[in-house]
A protein has these predicted regions:
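DnaQ-like (DEDDh/DEDDy) 3′-5′ exonuclease domain used for proofreading
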Residues: 1-209, 323-326, 330-346, 359-396, ...
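Catalytic palm subdomain of template-directed nucleic-acid polymerases
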Residues: 625-659
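Common nucleic-acid-contacting/processivity interface regions adjacent to the catalytic cores
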Residues: 308-428, 432-434, 503-512, 518-520, ...
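Conserved DEDDh/DEDDy metal-dependent 3′-5′ exonuclease domain
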Residues: 149, 155-285, 323
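Acidic, Mg2+-coordinating catalytic module of metal-dependent nucleases/exonucleases
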Residues: 207-222, 226, 268-362
Length: 903
């Protein structure tokens, strides 16, 4: 195997690297790195180096990084550009690993850890770390073991040893239900005092130093607490042993929620799983507590316990340690499902960056472009700061609030990256500007063609067509790589299905799995051989196929995320290739493209349906259009369709054979009009939506921009046996809406779209009765605890105090002086409940930390004084009124004089 790096740090004038050698062993090296930088030189000077604009450059090799940094400063002082990679860690990685890195994740030591701290005076502040650490669970990926460090004797009480036998038992047998699959992997170590525990943990840490350090919220709590606690007891030099290079950095980050201390352990990449989840899950959750996310992802939360966590060690030490172990296990389970660690590794090694830099699209793309240009002897420009300036965003069409029975949507593939490639937008391809006409003149093709020579965007920018831009070239590479890896993924998936089929009737003759490449479809010969394999061999092959599928999926998702993140980087003033003109060219072209195709689709469908001036495109947003197909169905005649599948088949065929070619012709005309480098605006049919044939359902409705619901039967060619709801921007999708109300509103929408008004009215009556019987947490609304201090006037709400902040202040007064009650933390989510007049809390509402039960101290009073009427009106009826008003339906049956008679 070839070497690959694990971590790389610049400390002083040296590069410190942890890496895996060719024998698969972890090594460390200190390198006195000699970086290269570049300066422009005369045209007459012989050189093989050129900047991205084609200007000749001369290479300067420095004795060390300090000299290189000083040269950059001297160049800046005299107003000259110092070109090349000034992040010497990235430059070192590029020089050392000038090949595609094939990493082995089994060699990368990933630690997942969690600490417990008993604090008698509220939340244990990590920057102070004044209370003992009384439990640590540390999972090591290479050992596949859970190492548990348990403090038996503490200032807050002495406890008996934890029992693995009790932990494994069912709860009704007095056990903790620690899963059997991890029981044998637990190594339990009790300690009589904290000094012994911490020193043993530090020794263990140095023997098994993590490459990747993860856990839930470890960057904000566990890491700084462990570091500061060791520092408090043994001194700073001992705490620095947590870094394999004995180098740490303490940084205080200030934001609107207050301050927090971040400890950087040089030589270890921290991938806090809460941050990975927020970045890569693409979900908006009402709470990011581990308990809530575990329930959401795994359908099982943290280990439950009675009373406050501050009393758990003393009251039930057995449960306390099991709780600590399960916290670590839940993070492992979430990653086993989501694969965010592997995704980060794949992205990091592809870009050749420190693995923790995957959180930054700027750092990631800077490295990708640098490495690509370096292969061509092209020199990157110097990074410069730019003023923050606004520029246009995406186009969103204002819909007419209404019901829409039959709808088709069409979606542009990777709009912004495709615009960059089509127009050839890059810093070095700018050719000049042209006189700009109003945007609607370009949309309607009545403005003069901007240029016969250059590729244009309607913001007035012109780009060369005779050269490939750096940015479009890199996007194209990643596009092609994604296509390749997606092909591998799908082939492995198909091969897995063939193996599964053979497992239904395994043979006993051959007990040796075939040596095949799962990235490509099995040949007929291999398929025949598979039929002769034993179940053991087939299961081994299925495992390999599934592993290949996961590898392909991770690689293609990585490329997809990279593609989509580049536009964000290009619009960031800190990006090396930022140019406001280019950012504006991308978004303005996108605005034109969507409205251009709206015009073309309307023209085409008016022609098909024999109508004039009809607006068939009812909505558009950024890269998608939504087309009303009512008149298309009417032209054929709804009665002609046998069943729902029949009309879905018809619209599918109409979209594929008629509309997609018409759309493609329209975009080709636009490409010609703008004289672009190549045609890359590809728009495919996405959703086909409508009610079941013969039902009273309405099919779909819009209430406003980015707020709609559709009953979808087919999505991108995948036909559903049962329709799926596509809901965007409505209260069902908002984390502030109570969970039970989300579910009820979704059922209301389903009935509106599939069954009609009468069914909706029946359900409304049912839920109105059921509401008061629901668990209080499931009907509490959710808000963020922002700017508490701004509205806090001596513990009471100040002028213009928001409703949920008023509730937080009510809660704080109610629990004042009680350290066992969960504290509301600035910036975190809270549950909110309205209260009836005359309540003992003296205010309209109360709010407490989300993801938790309200403290027993005040629970009975809160439940007694809950205002169900206000809660139902605010969270359920008001949103429902918005849906039904737009859809021209009534959620309650209106009284009529005719109801008094039997006829």
């Amino acid at each position: 195997m070839k070497e690959f790096y694990l971590t790389v740090e610049q400390i002083g004038d040296s590069i410190f690297e942890r890496y895996i050698d060719s024998n698969g062993r972890e090594r460390t090296r200190e390198v006195e790195y000699k970086p290269s930088l570049f300066a422009h030189c005369p045209e007459s000077q012989a050189t093989k180096y050129f900047d991205i604009y084609g200007k000749p450059c001369t290479r300067k090799l420095f004795a060390n990084m300090r000299d290189a940094s000083q040269w950059i400063k001297r160049m800046e002082d005299i107003g000259l550009e110092a070109l090349g990679m000034d992040d010497f860690k990235l430059a070192y990685l590029s020089d050392t690993y000038n090949y595609e890195i094939k990493y082995d994740h089994t060699k990368i030591r990933v630690a997942n850890f969690d600490i417990e701290v008993t604090s008698p005076d509220g939340f244990p502040e990590p920057s102070q770390a004044k209370h003992p650490i009384d439990a640590i669970t540390h999972y090591d990926s290479i050992d596949d073991r859970f190492y548990v460090f348990d403090l038996l004797n503490s200032p807050y009480g002495n406890v008996e040893e934890w029992s693995i036998e009790i932990a494994a038992k069912l709860q009704e047998q007095g056990g903790d239900e620690v899963p059997s699959e991890i029981i044998d992997k637990i190594i339990y170590m009790p300690f009589d005092n904290e000094k012994e525990l911490l020193m043993e943990y530090l020794n263990f840490w140095q023997q098994k130093t993590p490459v990747i350090l993860t856990g839930w919220n470890v960057e904000s709590f566990d890491i700084p607490y462990v570091y500061n606690r060791i520092k408090n007891i043994f001194g700073e030099s001992t705490a620095k042993r947590l870094s394999p290079h004995r180098k740490t950095r303490v940084k205080v980050i200030e934001n609107m929620y207050g301050s927090r201390e971040i400890i950087t352990l040089f030589g270890i990449s921290v991938l806090d799983y809460i941050d990975l989840y927020k970045k890569f899950s693409f979900t908006n959750q009402p709470s990011y507590s581990l308990d809530y996310i575990s329930e959401f992802e795994l359908n099982v939360g943290k280990l439950k316990y009675d009373g406050p966590i501050s009393k758990l060690r003393e009251s039930n030490h057995q449960r306390y340690i099991s709780y600590n172990i399960i916290d670590v296990y839940r993070v492992l389970q979430i990653d086993a499902k989501r694969q965010f660690i592997n995704l980060s590794l794949d992205m990091g090694y592809y870009a050749k960056i420190q693995i923790q830099s995957v959180f930054s699209p700027i750092k990631t793309w800077d490295a990708i472009i640098f490495n690509s240009l370096k292969e061509q002897n092209k020199v990157i420009p110097q990074g410069r700061s730019h003023p923050v300036q606004p520029y246009p965003g995406a186009f969103v069409k204002e819909p007419i609030p209404n019901r829409y029975k039959y709808v088709m949507s069409f979606d542009l593939t990777s709009l912004y990256p495709s615009i960059i490639r089509q127009v050839n937008i890059s810093p070095e391809t700018i050719a000049g500007t042209f006189k700009v006409a109003p945007l609607h003149d370009y949309i309607n093709a009545i403005a003069e063609r901007p240029s016969d020579v250059y590729s244009c965007s309607p913001n007035g920018m012109m780009y060369y067509k005779d050269r490939d831009g750096v940015v479009p070239t890199e996007i194209t590479k990643v596009f092609n790589q994604r296509k390749e890896h997606k092909g591998y993924m799908l082939a492995a998936q198909r091969n897995g299905e063939i193996i599964k089929e053979a497992l239904h009737n395994p043979n006993l003759s051959v007990d040796e799995p075939l040596d095949v490449d799962y990235r490509f479809d099995f040949s007929d010969e291999i398929k025949e051989k598979i039929k002769k394999l034993s179940a053991k061999s087939l299961n081994e092959m299925l495992f390999r196929a599934q592993r290949t599928e996961v590898a392909g999926m991770t690689a293609q998702i990585n490329r997809k995320l990279l593609i989509n993140s580049l536009y964000g980087a290009l619009g960031n003033v800190w990006f090396r290739y930022y140019d406001l003109r280019n950012a504006t060219a991308i978004t303005t072209f996108g605005q034109m493209a969507l409205q251009w195709i709206e015009r073309k689709v309307n023209e085409y469908l008016n022609e098909v349906c024999g109508t004039e001036g009809e607006a068939f495109v009812l909505y558009g947003d950024t890269d998608s259009i939504y087309v009303s197909a009512d008149k298309i169905i009417d032209k054929v005649g709804e009665s002609k369709f046998r069943d729902t599948n029949h009309w879905v088949d018809f619209l599918d065929k109409f979209a594929r054979e008629r509309m997609e070619p018409a759309i493609d012709r329209g975009f080709r005309e636009m490409c010609e009009y703008m004289n672009n480098k190549q045609h890359l605006m590809f728009m495919d049919r996405e959703a086909i939506a409508g009610p079941p044939l013969g039902s009273k359902g309405i099919g779909g409705f819009w209430t406003g921009k980015k707020r709609y619901a559709l009953n979808v039967w087919d999505m991108e060619g995948t036909r559903y046996a049962e329709p799926k709801l596509k809901i965007m921007g409505l209260e069902t999708q908002k984390s502030s809406t109570p969970k039970a109300v989300q579910k009820a509103l979704k059922e209301c929408i389903r009935r509106m779209l599939q069954e009609g008004e009468e069914s909706l009215q029946e359900y409304f009556k049912e839920f109105e009765k059921e509401f008061r019987q629901l668990n209080y947490i499931s009907i509490a609304s959710v808000s963020s605890a922002n700017n508490i201090a701004k509205y806090d006037v001596g513990g009471f709400p100040g002028p213009k105090c928001p409703f949920h902040i008023r509730g937080i202040l009510t809660y704080n007064r109610a629990i004042k002086g009680n350290i066992d009650a969960p504290q509301v933390v600035e910036g975190e989510k809270v549950y909110v409940l309205p209260l009836r007049e005359g309540n003992p809390f003296g205010d309209k509402c109360i709010a407490w930390p989300s993801g938790t039960e309200i403290t027993d101290l005040i629970k009975d009073d809160v439940l007694h004084w809950m205002d169900y009427t206000v809660l139902l009106e605010k969270t359920f009826i008001k949103p429902l009124e918005g849906f039904t008003s737009a859809a021209k339906l009534d959620y309650e049956k209106k009284a009529s004089l005719f109801d008094m008679f039997d006829f």
